[in-house]
């Protein structure tokens, strides 16, 4: 998968694959995180291709909620997880490229 930039609501987010990804605030190893101030999405590059795509979709949901001003929900995993899972399934089951 090669996506270097993605436009989310008019904001261009850079997408980076990184080894041994550590989330800056929690200092924990994560599969992905979004830096809203830098408009950047980081994804662990040791994941399988499928998990990289799923993680990208998950982080896109975070960024989409952020960019729409959904301050109460952009970081709520109870909202982001099901939306991300469903969006990935729709794309995958309909053979839409990610």
Enumerate the language-model features and the residues they cover.
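Active-site scaffold of zinc-dependent metalloenzymes
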Residues: 2-51, 66-67, 71-85, 89
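Active-site recognition of the HExxH zinc-binding catalytic motif
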Residues: 54-66
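Short, Lys/Arg-rich amphipathic alpha-helical interaction segments
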Residues: 94-98
């Amino acid at each position: 998968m090669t996506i270097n930039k993605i436009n989310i609501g008019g904001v261009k987010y850079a997408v980076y694959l990184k080894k041994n990804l550590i989330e800056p605030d929690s200092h924990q190893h994560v599969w992905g995180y979004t830096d809203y101030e830098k408009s950047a999405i980081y994804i662990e590059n040791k994941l399988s291709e499928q998990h990289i795509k799923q993680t990208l979709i998950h982080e896109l949901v975070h960024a989409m909620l952020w960019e729409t001003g959904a301050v109460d929900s952009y970081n709520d995993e109870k909202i982001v997880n099901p939306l991300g899972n469903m969006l990935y399934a729709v794309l995958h089951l309909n053979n839409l490229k990610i």
